[in-house]
Amino acid sequence: MMFHSLGLLYLFLYVTLAEDCIDRPCVECRHYIKQDDPCLHHGTKPMLFCDPQTNLIQESSTNFLECVQNRWVLRECVTGTIYESGRGCVDPTIQPFMQGFSVSGSGRVGDVCQYNTDCLSGMYCATGLCSCLSTYILRESYCYEKVNPNQPGCTYDVQCEAVWPGSKCRMDSSIGTCRCPEETHVARETRDGWVCISLRDLSSGGTAPLYFVCALPEGAGFKISLNDPSPSMGAFPVGCTVGSSATIEPVQGLHGGGACMWPSDGEYIGDVYDCIHTSPHINLAEKFPQSNYAPTADGVCCPSRALACIQPQLTGPNPSEPRWWYNSVTGTCQQFMWDSGATEAKYHSPNNFKTIQHCESYCRDTCQRGSPQYSTESAVHSERPITSCAASVSCANDFQCTAIGSQHLCCPTPGSVCSAKGGRPYDIQPRTSIHHPGFMVYTGKESIRFYYDPGTGRCQDFVYKGAGGNYNNFLSKHECEMYCARLQCERGSPLRIGEEAQRCQNNAQCPSSHECKADQGVCCPRKQTICAQPLRIGDCTENVKRYWYNARTRQCQMFEYTGCQGNDNNFDSIMDCQNFCKNAIPEPKCIQGQAYKDMFGNFVTCSNGMGCPANYECYFDGSQWGCCPTKAFTCSLNTDSGIQCGAGSTFKYYYNPQTQNCESFQYNGCDGNSNNFANRDACESYCSVGGCPNGGTPLRDHSGMVMVCGAQQTSCPDSHECIPVLVGNSLINRCCPTRAYMCGLPPQQGTQCGANYVQRYYFNIVTSQCTSFQFGGCDGNANNFLNIQQCRNFCMSNACPAGNVAYVDPNSQMPINCNEALSNSCPSGYACTFNPLINNHVCCGATDSGVCPEAEKAFIDTIDMSPRECLINIEQSCPANYLCRFNMQKNKYYCCSSITGKTCPVGKFLYKDLRTSQPIRCTIGRNDQCPDGFTCQSYLANAFQGFCCTANSVCPDNADYLIDDQSQQPRACTQGTFVSCPNGYACRSLTSSADGFCCKSGTGALPPSVTDGCPPNEYVYLVQGEIAQCDPFNPPNAPCPSEFTCQWSLSNQRYQCCGSNPAPTPQRPSDGCPNAQIAFRDADAVRVCSAGAANCPAGYFCQFSSSNNQFQCCGVSGGCPEESVAFVGMSGEPEKCVVGQSNCPRGFACQKSLAGHHVCCTVRKVACESNEVIIEGECHAQVGPGSECLANEQCTGGSVCEDAKCECRPPLKAVGGFCQEEIQCSSNQVLHNGLCHNKAKLGEACLTVRQCQENSGCIEGSCECKKGFIEKAGKCMTPVEKKSAVSSKSINNGVTCSKPGWNPLIDEEHERPKHCSPIGKACPNGYECQINNRRTQYLCCAPDMSMSSTVSIPSLPPPSTTTTERIMTTKKANLKVCPTGRTPYLLNGAPQKCTISRCPAGYECTYRNNGYHCCSMANKPGLTVAGTTGSVVSKSTPSPDQEKCPRGNPLIYPSTSSPVLCQPGKRGCPVGFGCVQSSTSNNHICCPSRHSDRPGYQSESFGLGAYYSRGPPAAINPCEGYLVLVTRGVNGRIEKRCERSCPFPQIPIGGVCYELKNKAT
């Protein structure tokens, strides 16, 4: 029985603890209910589980536990419902547990909230959800206030148990009151509220009166009562008088007559020890007469709440019982194991609680350190903490109002605690030391504690005697520093140099991350610094719920703090975190240096490159934008040692712009500028030390010295190249890394030195593509780029010379591949270069980039594709062969170079240094920079810089000179020698000396031979490439042009025109090809081609045109006549030939050039027939699918030339000489002659009998009944069937009119009698509404005309009438469905019936000829069409001008002159027309679907000539669908056929192919 009772108690505690586990760490709550655990009564409980992501106990929303046969069984709610405690599975859409929108004051625990007012009393809004305040307890989604023992106001036991374990809510006083556990505890009153005193000794289990019992630890409280070791006390506990406030003993020699005092020296300790009634209540002097107790002594001195909560954790020698203690450092309650049977007092501490709720209520829900300010009452134990300081009461000195849960207490200030007072206003005992050593108790022991010395600002250690003292008493130095740091800084710890706080008098003595707190003289961290610190959970083993500010998300988040080694971004509550870090802007992480701050120390946020000051650029670090220093600014700054922060200093590196090297300097630890690098490599890599054009640093040897390379020095490895770099004012050859080496490095993640890893890109040599990777921010390598475009620019251009980049497609942003075998396959200024990294050719070069003069290119930075800037007053600021040019528009200097390599003015020679073979740059106007005979010159006017060039021209008339291959100097020669200069050059001199230079003998594009026969320095006059002859004796017959004279030529033995200047060459119109090249034209249009594809005629090559921005066919003129081009042989020159002896390639002929030579030129274009096309200069006939071919131009009908045969590409097939899709007709169509035609009704037009119905045929273009059949109700039937049908309709299963001899009106649409209503006129003329013979319905009835002799029979056409006239007359009769002068509404060419649907506006339902049809309204003004008789047009009917076909003209209804409307998918248009949407409206009209060349096409084809007409046939698209009409010559005759496309160079106009002719021709 006893075991069963204990089991019930254990199960009760088990369940009670489980309800409080939610949102607690998993290690703190292991005893929640699980599946298969025992249970007592049937019911349900929420299922709790440990969330592995948060490591917290959570409640399942869809699962729960049900007690079945004394075991908990796991259950699951049905889909769409959630489990709610006390209600079971509920539908959240009917009664939502989580409110989507908060209503003020209506939120329960867990409901969504925005403000505290959205939640009920006792709650606050935490992280968007309503939560209980710390002084309230959760119960069934509501918060109830915790109630102290012996206090009223409880509703549930949990309100009492949260304050003291085992307490219950009793209703013995008609109101719920919390009572201590009966029989085992008694209630005792203190200033902090009532406590429950245990009367049982846990170590022995006895219940004998112990008298001197304290509340804590429960079960061993009698072991911690104060005992003065003085012999006068006789080993009795220190007594007191309950309620007394006396600070001095009333009777000398006796003790316990007042408040708590230490007997040995009389020190008042009543503010740190509570005087509690003995248990049971006795008078100590009477109970213990041998003692020195005063007569009024009736209490025992026990540690106050504030003193108990800062005591250490004591476990005892054999810990076995789980208990909780309050960690004043972390502000949380933590579990430990305790030895309840330990007999010695040194193993017990008042900081010992049975439950976590008791621990939190006792220690957490009060002041952090020290006792609160109490009210003044007559009895001390009746005093209570002041809880309304924020509203009506102000706190006394040394106290500050602090919010704790739902209360506001006056708590000791950190300044009071961290001082000599130690948070004790009544510490009246004088002493010489700042710390209070306490006093030695009978059973206590000494220990080392720490106190804060406000004079030194440091925490010092002292020996604590074990009892008493004050609150400037900390268990560890860390705890002391954490608490008392608030005395110096509002938040965070002061900056320290070793153990001492760094002193300051103003902000200039603190780093920018801190500010000087003048009253304390220390550097405190700024809000920006604290809130930007990363999450640091510490290195200890505790699990404390704290909050930190996530600068990236700008939100406060919870984390588990381990208890030590954290940082300042650590807050006790989410409210503290939010209030302090509100609107804090995180620090952007720059590549180098610190982001820019405003005058208030806040980081400046920019966007889209805007908002940064000079020398700063807008940079995105992966999570935010900030202003970071530019590379040029960083590398130009002087060294800055920064500000002292912390102990010691270090050595860093900076870039010295004067020496252009990285040098070390001593750094004080904080601030400085961005020219600050951790090591030499980082400095050299960032500032590109050594001038390596591709970036990177020069190669160093094993000793760390930079290697020098060259012809006589060490050679560079394959990964580097020997390049002259600028060092100071001189050039030194150094080994610089190649771009291929840099792009071949593996991706290096590096080390994290920023807030987060950032995305970077590297070149993957396996895929030859740029790929992303995560970079830590430091210690990377050269294969690291900010974005994918930088990666492509740098690595795709690795084969290009320095300053040149690969030409990029503006659309794809990828380099364009070129063909090295094709000349000029790259844009102007670019050369086709092989890139081994991507195993392809790219176009390398550069343009002026909008910053360089015309015909010059800029030095392009391959990283960002930007032109390099330079400084005009700094030597060697541009690479070799580049000059510093000024751009007026941008007001900046840029490095520029000639695209063609031109350096000096025309006729001048460039001087090169004999040692480096590099040109000497100079400043124009200075005479001390060039050697003798050379001056500083430039081929550009008004230039600031140039090169050293010869002072005088090399050749006369500034002619070009020949450069010797060996000396790279102008070739010297002597006039009159046999061989001195090669062909095209002549030995000339500026002086009378015979020594001269080889100068070009002709200028411009004219060949050298044009000077033959004329005196020196004169040129012959040419006419169409031939030397023009003249007659000096008869000038009018053979004159010379002006500036030319007729002279005798000794070499040619004739008179010819000679002049000092060559005749101007007629300029050809620009066609986009390079100079001396001609574009191939198709019908006066330049032929466009594809690079690398053989789609240019013979003699032409596919080259890129910069002016036309396209690839086009260009050929070398070579002096060929007219528009022909020369054949270029293996030598790269036009192939020369001899007429009649040399064989030119196919398509070429040996012709005389303008220079007088004979070269292979393309033959002239031949005129081909209309059915032929030119292929490789020859005419070839056009052929259809299945025929042999040479090129696509030959193939017709939409076919293409594949494997020398015209073929149709799938899914098209050859049908009648055309490529068409396989025709699939719908169920209401038939296939005829390759076209789908709608099935026709009787009287409708047809082309084949298959369109007509049963028993009918296509007779002269119309479906008519065959011989022996007559038409009835749209069908062909025999006369017997007609009579039978009429009879059946009349009888209609025996239903007839009530009058004999009367027949009902039959609805032809539904083949049933027409019903009517006897009220009103519901039947047509000639009919009356009668009830049927069965007396069930009313029918429209009329007399049987077949029985009357007065019935008028319509007259038939005379026998002489032709069949066609008979058909047309019948159709006219069929269309006479409206009264005279009124027009029917046509739908798909037929009058619309109104037996089912309503008529459109302007028409009314009218009966005529046994049917109801929509007819135009009679006598409506404005509806009669002028010029027509009885023709009415609806106002809504579109006019021909309003409705238009996509091709051709619409089918017109003559009576209304309007297009015929149709409905797609229902009733189609006549044969030859299709129902398509108008191109000008949403209506569907009948448009032509095929072509006919016959005039009068409408009458013969459709049989509808009297009612349908068409516009001019020429305006109609002659072919169906996408086909066009092509005119060709076949076997000597002209044929017109429909094909897929027009032959080149014709274009389609209105569906017909025409060849546009040039007006000039």
From Swiss-Prot:
Instruction: Give one GO term, molecular function aspect.
Output: serine-type endopeptidase inhibitor activity
At the top level, the lineage of the source is Eukaryota
- Where are the coiled-coil regions? none
Which cysteine pairs are joined by S-S bonds?
C309-C363, C333-C359, C459-C480, C531-C581, C540-C564, C556-C577, C635-C687, C645-C670, C662-C683, C743-C795, C753-C778, C770-C791
An example of a Gene Ontology cellular component annotation for this protein is: extracellular region
**InterPro entries named among the record's database cross-references:** Cuticle_assoc_divergent, Cys_repeat_1, EB_dom, Kunitz_BPTI, Kunitz_BPTI_sf, Lustrin_cystein, Prtase_inh_Kunz-CS
Cell wall biogenesis/degradation among keywords: no
Q: What are the entry keywords?
A: Disulfide bond, Protease inhibitor, Repeat, Secreted, Serine protease inhibitor, Signal
Tell me what organism the protein belongs to.
Caenorhabditis elegans
Question: What residue stretches are annotated with the BPTI/Kunitz inhibitor domain?
Answer: 309-363, 434-484, 531-581, 635-687, 743-795
- Cellular compartments annotated: Secreted
Q: Which residues form the WR1 domain?
A: 365-412, 487-525, 588-629, 690-737, 798-845, 850-897, 902-950, 953-1000, 1012-1059, 1071-1115, 1118-1162, 1177-1209, 1223-1266, 1295-1342, 1376-1416, 1443-1488
Mind telling me what this protein is named?
Answer: Uncharacterized protein ZC84.1
Q: May I ask which residue range the UniProt record assigns to the signal sequence?
A: 1-18
Concerning SMART domains, the annotation shows: KU (SM00131), WR1 (SM00289)
